[in-house]
């Protein structure tokens, strides 16, 4: 689950008539819930027969560092990194 849990996320905030994507840290409870949510969500999209097989394959992929849930986490981190210049706007 540690390979899936996000450290940062971006939140939209309207400042001066413009929306900014502001990176912020994720609380530990939210990290865990997002990680589990993504794990189940991407396991459901897999092509194996039963949900047990889908979930097992997604967990194995996440442990090895690939899989859709890990890609989602990397995408979120990339977005936060790209918008790092707006970090001084507090949430």
From Swiss-Prot:
Gene3D superfamilies for this protein: Ribosomal protein S7 domain (1.10.455.10)
* This protein's UniProt keywords: Ribonucleoprotein, Ribosomal protein, RNA-binding, rRNA-binding, tRNA-binding
SUPFAM superfamilies, A to Z: Ribosomal protein S7
Which is one Pfam family of this protein?
Ribosomal_S7
One of the GO biological process terms? translation
Query: What are its GO cellular component terms?
Result: small ribosomal subunit
- Matches recorded under InterPro entries: Ribosomal_uS7, Ribosomal_uS7_bac/org-type, Ribosomal_uS7_dom, Ribosomal_uS7_dom_sf
Q: Which GO terms describe its molecular function?
A: rRNA binding; structural constituent of ribosome; tRNA binding
Q: How does it assemble?
A: Part of the 30S ribosomal subunit. Contacts proteins S9 and S11.
UniProt lists the family membership as follows: Belongs to the universal ribosomal protein uS7 family.
Q: What task does this protein carry out?
A: One of the primary rRNA binding proteins, it binds directly to 16S rRNA where it nucleates assembly of the head domain of the 30S subunit. Is located at the subunit interface close to the decoding center, probably blocks exit of the E-site tRNA.
Name of the featured protein: Small ribosomal subunit protein uS7
């Amino acid at each position: 689950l540690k390979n899936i849990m996000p450290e940062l996320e971006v939140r939209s905030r309207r400042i001066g008539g413009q929306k900014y994507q502001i990176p912020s840290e994720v609380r530990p409870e939210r990290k865990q819930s997002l990680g589990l949510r993504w794990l189940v969500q991407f396991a459901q999209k897999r092509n194996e027969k039963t949900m047990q097989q889908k979930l097992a394959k997604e967990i194995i992929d996440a442990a090895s560092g690939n899989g859709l849930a890990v890609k989602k986490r990397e995408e979120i981190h990339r977005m936060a990194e790209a918008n790092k210049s707006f970090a001084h706007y507090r949430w």
